[in-house]
A protein has these predicted regions:
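PAPS-dependent sulfotransferases, especially Golgi type II membrane carbohydrate sulfotransferases
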Residues: 1-9, 174-176, 203-271
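PAPS-dependent sulfotransferase catalytic core
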Residues: 1-74, 134
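PAPS/PAP-binding and catalytic site of the sulfotransferase fold
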Residues: 20-34, 98, 182-210
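PAPS-dependent sulfotransferase catalytic domain
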Residues: 67-68, 124-199, 254, 260
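Glycine-rich phosphate-binding loop used to anchor ATP phosphates in small-molecule kinases
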Residues: 70-92
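Conserved phosphate-donor/acceptor-positioning beta-strand/loop module used by diverse small-molecule
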Residues: 97-119
């Protein structure tokens, strides 16, 4: 038993943050509906908000973190982490564990993703009154030179500089994710298809975990029910685009490259 390969019981689900998006939150809760699954929700992204161990953008060594999950989750048939890491950070996992540790990257329509990215920051990232460390970090890494020709802003104009930075993520950070050898899955497809959800689970767990119809009924009943602390929101790409002001339209056209737009179009998104 000492030689048993525990690595293949671990998996990663990546994204460029989930920012309080209900459907992104729904996915790990859905996975955890099976008692043989143990799934973290952005664990290593949230820790720096509360513990002075590292900066918000830093993460533990991912190979060591994989072994840690394998150790503490031995009582589960499968265990994984959602959203602590980005797809472009998984190369060490691929080299160390190969196909034993499986991984998928979850993408979202850019307009909707951007809405939650900005909202998360304008609402102080779920921190209490007076707790500004996370948003202070966000401000400290804004690349102001990139936005000098756009609508001006101050530190207090979080809705402006967060919008610009979110566009930079769409054009740069997410494009790095697309270059990594990983399955990219649209979140919209998972929430609209039980088959695609179960296919993803089968892939991640090497066919070790499945869900009964009653479990799936419960899982999909949560899609439009806010979790603790959430607001009831229904955000559509069309609604978002129509709500933009001129400065937002200008910023989108100047910051998001055509190459980036084409990549999202390739995955079935419309602008």
């Amino acid at each position: 038993m000492d030689n048993y390969n525990h690595d293949s019981h671990i998996f990663y689900i990546t994204a460029q943050g989930y920012a309080g998006d209900h459907w992104y939150s729904w996915l790990p809760k859905a996975l955890n509906a099976n008692p043989e699954m143990f799934v973290y929700l952005a664990n290593e992204g949230s820790r720096p908000k509360y513990f002075a161990e590292r900066t918000r953008s830093e993460r533990p060594d991912i190979v060591s973190f994989t072994k840690f999950i394998s150790d503490v989750c031995r009582t589960y048939m499968a265990a994984g982490d959602c959203y602590s890491y980005r797809a472009n950070q998984l190369e060490p996992v691929a080299k160390e564990f190969g196909d034993n540790v499986r991984k998928v990257n979850i993408i979202r329509h850019p307009y909707v993703w951007l809405y939650f990215y900005v909202r998360w920051r304008t609402s102080n990232m779920r921190m209490g009154t007076g707790e500004t460390k996370p948003i202070e970090h966000e401000w400290s890494i804004v690349e102001h030179e990139l936005y000098k020709d756009l609508k001006p802003y101050t530190k207090e104009d979080v809705h402006i500089w967060a919008f610009y930075r979110g566009l930079t993520f769409l054009s740069n950070h997410m494009m790095r994710d697309f270059k990594f050898d990983i399955k990219h899955i649209r979140l919209e497809d998972i929430v609209s298809s039980r088959d695609k959800f179960t296919q993803m689970v089968s892939y991640l767990t090497h066919d070790r975990v499945g869900y009964t119809n009653s479990q799936l009924d419960e899982i999909y009943s949560w899609l439009y029910k806010p979790f603790r602390g959430e607001d009831k929101l229904y955000i559509t790409p069309k609604g978002q685009r129509e709500s933009w002001e001129d400065w937002q339209i200008e910023a989108f056209e100047k910051i998001v490259s055509q190459e980036s737009k084409n990549k999202f179009i390739e995955y079935g998104y419309e602008f």
